[in-house]
Amino acid sequence: MSEERTERPERTERPERPQQRGSGPRKRRPFQRRKVCRFCADKTLVIDYKDPRVLRSFITERGKIVPRRISGNCSAHQREITEAIKRARNIALIPIASTHVIA
């Protein structure tokens, strides 16, 4: 092995980065009012696994539980909704998927 080191070639300047697409001002989404948890707003509403009518409004047509950011529930009530839906599915009060989906 030789003790000689080879010199690295001197770095050249980097080429200019291409401009990002749409370098103009960004379009903003219109202001959307924050959703309010319907269970916090109306204290008379109760989350119950035996009431499939209320639970179906929190399930998609494919049978998935609607997320918090879409339903507008607070985290505490979203957890209760999730537990109630799972209990109702377990004892067959609501179907796991409303229809058979062929993909």
Swiss-Prot record:
Gene3D superfamilies for this protein: Ribosomal protein S18 (4.10.640.10)
Residue spans of biased composition, Basic and acidic residues class: 1-19
Tree of life domain: Bacteria
A Gene Ontology biological process term: translation
Annotated region (Disordered), positions in chain: 1-33
GO molecular function annotation: small ribosomal subunit rRNA binding; structural constituent of ribosome
Biased composition, class Basic residues, residue ranges: 24-33
An example Gene Ontology CC term for this record: cytosolic small ribosomal subunit
UniProt keywords, alphabetically: Ribonucleoprotein, Ribosomal protein, RNA-binding, rRNA-binding
Functional note: Binds as a heterodimer with protein bS6 to the central domain of the 16S rRNA, where it helps stabilize the platform of the 30S subunit.
Protein name: Small ribosomal subunit protein bS18
Species of the source: Geobacter sulfurreducens (strain ATCC 51573 / DSM 12127 / PCA)
Taxonomic lineage from the root: Bacteria, Pseudomonadati, Thermodesulfobacteriota, Desulfuromonadia, Geobacterales
UniProt gene name: rpsR
